[in-house]
Curated annotation (Swiss-Prot):
Name of the encoding gene: nfuA
Presence of the UniProt keyword Manganese in the record: no
Assembly: Homodimer.
Functional summary from the UniProt entry: Involved in iron-sulfur cluster biogenesis. Binds a 4Fe-4S cluster, can transfer this cluster to apoproteins, and thereby intervenes in the maturation of Fe/S proteins. Could also act as a scaffold/chaperone for damaged Fe/S proteins.
Protein name: Fe/S biogenesis protein NfuA
Pfam family, one: Fe-S_biosyn
Domain of life of the native organism: Bacteria
Amino acid sequence: MSAITITEAAHDYLADLLAKQNTTGIGIRIFITQPGTPYAETCIAYCKPGEEKPDDIALALKSFTAWIDGTSEPFLEDALVDYATDRMGGQLTIKAPNAKVPMVNEDSPMNERINYYLQTEINPGLASHGGQVTLIDVVEEGIAVLQFGGGCQGCGQADVTLKEGIEKTLLARIPELKGVRDVTDHTNRENAYY
């Protein structure tokens, strides 16, 4: 059972497109570029027989096979592919609510959990100042190495944000995390919020 739903309207639209390719056995491949990041993009491409990847998951549909990229599959949880007609013809839409931020649990690796909380709890607040923070690495038995960007780089309040906001939030959510360290070059104050 796949985590992706392809509506009947989308299936019929895609089946029609595939039939026009004049390639026996052609299907589609669904994947995400840069999954789990703010830059994630969900994509559908033609997939001729033999073009599927070894870790792809086959989703057999009525008229064709949809190949789901194995790496992207967890990020495609609750994804919906739909087709809606309009005055201009119609539009294929892909909604993948977990593409940018994967759902994690306490068994997920620490770096995935840190990234999850950075994207869902920390960065939305920093975005109001035009900033963000990124996980660089987890070192020394549980120290998260972070880097500020945008309006946070060079900001005079970065230390307070790091210790009072980010570190407290992450320590409350991830008990085995021991602390955080900032590796940002704050001498560049060109875009700093404060």
